[in-house]
């Protein structure tokens, strides 16, 4: 929680500004996978105040944002305060809170839905660029995941184990239902996110037909096999092997090559290079490299 009254009550005093400073300092090193946790059901934190804690912590952009629910264990301080806090909780493991003086059972269920959406779309790290755009469409980041959860429920999509590709398709359907402008740009970002993670051979429906024709792809790989300009570490492979091991995609009018042998150590995303334009695009002779796979929409 980032609520001063809450953290004082649970005897976990902290200076959130100092926490922010430390988190950002660790992020600057670029070599640590950060997990930040939020617990629902704490004293003095109702639904709206929890949403504020969510916004505060989400703004730090950890690799994982874990939403948990208070566990009322015998012998703990929370157990001692059961009556004061009007705690209702499960009578068997994991003894999770069901409602409190500040948080109704319906609120807990709503937060469970938000938790699932954060886990699927944020913590998976598979929708980075699409989410970055979506965050701008909503009043705040909590509202985004709240809306996603509501969309799942209203369309009978919750309580189902969806495939990875289906998660992309559902997100695109959500975007088309909620976003008035730039839907095509969102589609392009979904394609980018899709191929950053995996060299998908069977394109999902939302991705449409192959965006790079065979002649253009053949010309690129033939030249790359001779010059080795973009793909490093592939020296022992010919043009046909390069084509199988990497991926070419046309995104927002630009050509990109996805390198799956060289991935970001934190995100596991492929490295990606902008190759459209050849020498004219890179007067210095060095191709643009999008941060080891941390490609943002600004690059595309």
Predicted region positions:
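Radical SAM enzyme core and accessory elements
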Residues: 116-300
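Contiguous mid-protein beta-loop-alpha structural module that forms a pocket-lining wall or clamp
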Residues: 57-64, 68-162
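Conserved non-cysteine loop/helix-boundary elements of the Radical SAM core domain that shape
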Residues: 1-92, 98-99
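Generic alpha-helical secondary structure signal
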Residues: 5, 17, 21, 48, ...
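Short coil/turn linker and secondary-structure boundary residues
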Residues: 2, 14, 45, 103-106, ...
């Amino acid at each position: 929680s980032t609520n001063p009254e809450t953290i004082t009550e649970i005897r976990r005093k902290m200076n959130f500004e100092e926490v922010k400073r430390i988190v950002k300092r660790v992020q600057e090193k670029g070599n640590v996978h950060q997990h930040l946790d939020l617990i629902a059901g704490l004293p003095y934190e109702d639904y709206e105040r929890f949403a504020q804690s969510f916004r505060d912590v989400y703004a730090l952009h950890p690799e994982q944002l874990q939403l948990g629910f208070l566990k009322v264990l015998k012998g703990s301080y929370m157990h001692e305060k059961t009556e004061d806090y009007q705690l209702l909780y499960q009578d068997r493991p994991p003894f999770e809170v069901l409602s409190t003086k500040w948080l109704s059972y319906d609120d807990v269920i709503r937060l469970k839905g938000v938790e699932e959406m954060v886990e699927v779309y944020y913590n998976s790290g598979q929708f980075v660029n699409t989410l970055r755009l979506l965050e701008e469409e909503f009043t705040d980041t909590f509202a985004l995941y709240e809306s996603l959860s509501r969309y799942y429920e209203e369309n009978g999509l919750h309580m189902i184990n969806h495939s990875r590709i289906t998660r992309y398709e559902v997100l695109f359907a959500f975007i088309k239902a909620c976003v008035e402008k730039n839907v095509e740009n969102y589609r392009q970002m979904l394609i980018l996110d899709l191929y950053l993670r995996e060299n998908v051979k069977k394109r999902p429906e939302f991705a449409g037909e192959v965006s790079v024709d065979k002649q253009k792809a053949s010309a690129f790989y033939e030249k790359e096999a001779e010059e080795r300009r973009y793909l490093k570490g592939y020296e022992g492979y010919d043009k046909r092997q390069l084509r199988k091991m990497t991926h070419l995609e046309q995104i927002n009018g630009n050509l990109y090559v996805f390198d799956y042998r060289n991935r970001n150590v934190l995100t596991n995303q492929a490295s990606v290079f902008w190759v459209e334009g050849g020498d004219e695009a890179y007067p210095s002779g060095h191709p643009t490299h999008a941060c080891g796979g941390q490609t943002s929409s600004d690059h595309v």
